[in-house]
Design a protein with these regions (language model features):
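Intrinsically disordered, charged and Pro/Gly-enriched terminal/linker segments
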Residues: 1-144
Length: 144
């Protein structure tokens, strides 16, 4: 993965998405290009070298956040793509609560209430098992 290109695209997307006159369509393009570049761990062949772990984690966190931001932007237009992005995030990090909320909203837009509720229940179980905590208030509010 070209980490510099990935980060540059995310930065451009952030600049386009914010500001007095957001350019959402262009931001979506930058985020989508960045997500397409992310294929997993940074320098996987050097996984056990200490110097790569902080950078690997930083890039992964940036990628997961970018996938959720992109999913949020795409939600009104293509809820199925938003759902796919949420599921990709959860496959990498099953405790990423923002991805559960995105998944719940995508299912709700598709009028698939049972799956939205199931997503919440999975979130509750995973967070309890991993950390012994309940979901954030905004997650519970979305459920209710």
């Amino acid at each position: 993965m070209d980490a510099e290109a990935f980060e540059s695209l995310v930065t451009s997307g952030n600049q386009l998405a914010s500001g007095p006159e957001p350019r959402t369509s262009e931001a979506i393009g930058c985020y989508a290009d960045a997500v397409a570049l992310y294929h997993g761990d940074y320098l996987p062949e050097r996984r056990y070298e200490d110097w790569t772990s902080a950078e690997r984690e930083r890039i992964q966190l940036l990628a997961l956040n970018t996938m959720v931001v992109l999913g949020d932007l795409l939600l009104p237009r293509t809820p199925l793509e938003s759902l796919r992005l949420a599921q990709r995030v959860l496959a990498i990090d099953p405790v990423w609560e923002d991805a559960y909320r995105l998944q719940m909203r995508a299912f709700a837009i598709q009028r698939n209430r049972p799956m939205a509720l199931k997503s919440y229940q999975t979130c509750v179980q995973v967070l309890d098992k991993e950390f012994g905590v309940e979901p954030l208030p905004e997650t519970t509010e979305l459920y209710e």
